[in-house]
From Swiss-Prot:
It is found in: Cytoplasm. Keywords: Cytoplasm, Elongation factor, GTP-binding, Nucleotide-binding, Protein biosynthesis. The lineage of its organism: Archaea, Methanobacteriati, Methanobacteriota, Stenosarchaea group, Halobacteria. This is Elongation factor 2. The gene is fusA. It comes from Halobacterium salinarum (strain ATCC 700922 / JCM 11081 / NRC-1). The modification Diphthamide is found at H596. Its main location: cytoplasm. Coiled coil: none annotated. The keyword ATP-binding does not apply. Transmembrane segments: none annotated. Catalyzes the GTP-dependent ribosomal translocation step during translation elongation. During this step, the ribosome changes from the pre-translocational (PRE) to the post-translocational (POST) state as the newly formed A-site-bound peptidyl-tRNA and P-site-bound deacylated tRNA move to the P and E sites, respectively. Catalyzes the coordinated movement of the two tRNA molecules, the mRNA and conformational changes in the ribosome.
Length: 728
């Protein structure tokens, strides 16, 4: 029997025993060694050769991943590991580390119960480390820590036992500070922090395949002195044989990560807001393989032979070929064509996948990342809220008009596979817009369209995504319908930062129970009366109905919301989305005859009123910003900080870390386009840097008019602003 077939059979045998299952993700900052570590785990499980582990990068299956040397797509694999006499099934997802592909990390966290956070011993916790820890904790996923590249402390930095211990404890302290800061409201904070003593921290070198933890040192009798001696003597093979990395890490996974039976009762209330007393809730809590089928789709991929593959977590029931299942948000049922598990880049079909496992399913043609799939209609899972959002846009056109239909179909597929990509299709002009997390994100997607689909495309220069926001409160504005028979009286106020943050994080929505929504809004600072009158949440804005007993308003309210939505999707400055507005409807006068208060009357009246109220509330343009961190030798520190400041940026901190200086600051995304080549040139290639999207800020008044005019011209709008705009 082939090795691969044997492993698949072992996995199938363990699938029915959720106590022996561990669903985990490996997550880290870019280049901290996740995929090299995953190679070691695959070799330890007998899935690839130990000789090639670390160089094979078996989970980076796409050509561009191998070329660039980074993980772009999250990749799944199932493996087995024996721990304390019991076989365990480990379903592992290797996630990207580059900030532009953070959406894959967010989606992976919904499918797993444990996150193995990898940190470079030399660099320490970095911006994306903080992001992945935050993503894990928001999803109720327990972290453990692997500190990688310890060999560099010994061989490159020549650190002794005391210096090493100090540095490693500093890394652990930084990670625990992140965990504590994000779990303040949990009662079991100590259960979430990691420590050497309890075995939730391991150290080692993924490149040289050795690792240690407190339990492994107690078992083998090795200490850090022995490790330093063997590493300095270049006896790395002996070190690997005495304390192999895969055993140390997989033992930690089996011992400290929860199995689905322990995890699901705790996680279900976090990710699902349905009736907690229902049969389906009980079935998910119990991980009941005989219950109703419930699958949460976390990823969509395309196989050239099998078509679309939906990957996700089976929370209840058993998935089988031929089942007819509902997909949330769509009509009718989809028929399951096949079910399987992942073996790195390949999918292995199996007869069934029971609750508690991660499955690969074909036939769910209507599913997208975030879909709830079930054999009975049910309350869907909470949407997967991505921490970052699109900040860069490019136009994309087919070079040959014959390819236009295929390009449109491909773009729609791209946005289905990657929800952090936003697509705007204009079938009239043939020019389409693709928006993503950064330059690399868009570059990878456009190259894949050309390479995988064979469509030559032309892309425009990167364009930054802007927003509009009120900066004060407006006077009451009257909106009048074209027939003069309907009037609406509206004001606009600023939403507080805390309320806006709750909306951005998905903590408050119209999908949640009304009482719960009120409580969240009041905790964020909204007064009780206002929280009780929330009529709708439109994007990142809140609509309050302050009216009392207006005749015919109930049957007209849907049109009022449509008008508000129109006005907020295209703000009055540059037709950019509006955020941070609280719109109040104070009064209305409606014609008694429904034919005179239809869409053509109500929508323009409310849209116009909101736009004029926004202008009166001193609406301004918001620009996206990025946190910037540059690690550079001290002689180039001035050049590095100059690169940030010369881009309308601000340097917030400069400090020494090891033999390098660290420059930390903030800069507008628009000015950071082309930063890579400029920072290399300014520092003679000696700098390493990281950027992370940090939301939006109000653009300086002296730049507002110029940028607004550029946007309006690009969109084919009039290049003069309404006369009433006088606040900048």
């Amino acid at each position: 029997m082939g090795r691969r077939k044997k492993i698949v059979e072992q996995c199938e045998r363990l699938m029915d025993n959720p106590e022996q299952i561990r669903n985990i993700a490996i997550a880290a900052h870019v280049d901290h060694g996740k995929t090299t570590l995953t190679d070691n785990l695959l070799a330890g499980a007998g899935m690839i050769s130990e000789d090639t582990a670390g160089q094979q990068l078996a989970m980076d299956t796409e050509e561009d991943e191998q070329e660039r040397g980074i993980t772009i797509d999250a990749a799944n694999v199932s493996m087995t590991h024996e721990y304390e006499g019991d076989d365990h099934l480990i379903n592992l997802i290797d996630t990207p580390g580059h900030v532009d592909f953070g959406g894959d990390v967010t989606r992976a966290m919904r499918a797993v119960d444990g996150a193995l956070v990898v940190v470079d011993a030399v660099e320490g916790a970095m911006p994306q480390t903080e992001t992945v820890v935050r993503q894990a904790l928001r999803e109720g996923v327990k972290p453990t820590l692997f500190i990688n590249k310890v060999d560099r402390l010994i061989s490159e930095l020549q650190e002794g036992p005391e210096e090493m211990q100090e540095r490693l404890l500093s890394v652990i302290g930084d990670v625990n500070e992140l965990i504590r800061g994000m779990t303040e409201e949990k009662d079991d904070i100590e259960d979430w922090t990691v420590s050497v003593e309890d075995g939730t921290v391991a150290f080692g070198s993924a490149l040289y395949k050795w690792g240690v933890s407190m339990p492994s040192m107690q078992r083998t009798g090795m200490d850090f002195g022995d490790i330093i001696d063997l590493e300095r003597s270049d006896k790395r093979e002996e070190l690997h044989e005495q304390t192999p990395l895969a055993d140390v890490v997989l033992d930690m996974v089996a011992e400290h990560f929860p199995n689905p039976i322990d995890a699901q009762p705790r996680r279900i209330p976090t990710v699902w807001r349905g009736d907690a007393d229902s049969e389906i809730a009980e079935s998910m809590r119990l991980v009941d393989e005989d219950g109703e089928v419930v699958l949460m789709v976390t990823d969509i991929g395309v196989d050239p032979h099998a078509g679309e593959i939906a990957a996700g977590r089976v929370f209840s029931g058993t998935l089988e070929k031929g089942q007819e299942l509902y997909v949330s948000g769509t009509a009718g049922k989809n028929r399951v064509q096949s079910v399987g598990i992942y073996m790195g880049g390949e999918r292995e079909e199996v007869d069934e996948v029971p609750a508690g496992n991660i499955a690969a399913v074909t036939g769910l043609k209507d599913a997208i990342a975030g879909s709830t799939v079930s054999n009975e209609e049910m309350t869907p899972f909470e949407s997967i809220d991505h921490i970052s959002e699109p900040v860069i846009t490019k136009s994309i056109e087919a070079q040959n008009m014959d390819d236009l239909p295929k390009l449109i179909e491909t773009l729609r597929q791209v946005s289905k596979e990657d929800p952090t990509i936003s697509i705007e299709i204009n079938e009239d002009t043939g020019e389409h817009l693709i928006s993503g997390q950064g330059e690399l994100h868009l570059e990878v997607q456009t190259q894949r369209i050309e390479r995988n689909q064979g469509i030559p495309v032309t892309t425009g220069e990167p364009i930054v995504v802007y927003r509009e926001t009120p900066t004060s409160d407006s006077q009451e504005v009257e909106g009048v319908s074209p027939n003069r028979h309907n009037k609406f009286y509206i004001t606009v106020e600023q939403l507080s930062d805390d309320v806006l943050e709750e909306i951005r994080l998905g903590e408050v929505s119209m999908d949640m129970p009304e009482q719960e929504r009120r409580e969240v809004l009041q905790e964020a600072g909204m007064d009780k009366e206002t929280s009780q009158d929330v009529e709708n949440i439109i994007g990142r804005n809140i609509f309050i109905d302050d009216t009392k007993g207006i005749q015919h308003l109930n049957e007209t309210m849907e049109l009022v919301v449509d008008g508000l939505t129109d006005s907020l999707e295209d703000g009055p400055l540059a037709a950019e989305p509006v955020e941070g507005a609280l719109i109040r409807l104070h009064d209305a006068r409606l014609h008694e005859d429904a034919i005179h208060r239809g869409p053509a009357q109500v929508i323009p009246a409310t849209r116009d009123a909101v736009h004029r109220a926004l202008i009166d509330a001193d609406i301004r343009l918001l620009e996206p910003i990025q946190d910037v961190r540059i690690d550079v030798p001290s002689e180039h520190m001035g050049a590095a900080s100059g690169e940030v400041q010369g881009r309308r940026g601000r340097v917030d901190d400069m400090y020494q870390e090891g033999d390098l200086m660290v420059v930390e600051g903030i800069a507008p995304v628009d000015e950071m386009i082309g930063f890579s080549s400029d920072i290399r040139s300014a520092t003679e290639g000696r700098a390493s840097w990281n950027t992370e999207n940090a939301g939006f800020r109000v653009m300086a008044d002296n730049l507002q008019r110029e940028i607004i005019m550029e946007i309006r011209e690009r969109k084919g709008m009039k290049t003069e602003l309404p006369e009433s705009i006088t606040h900048f």
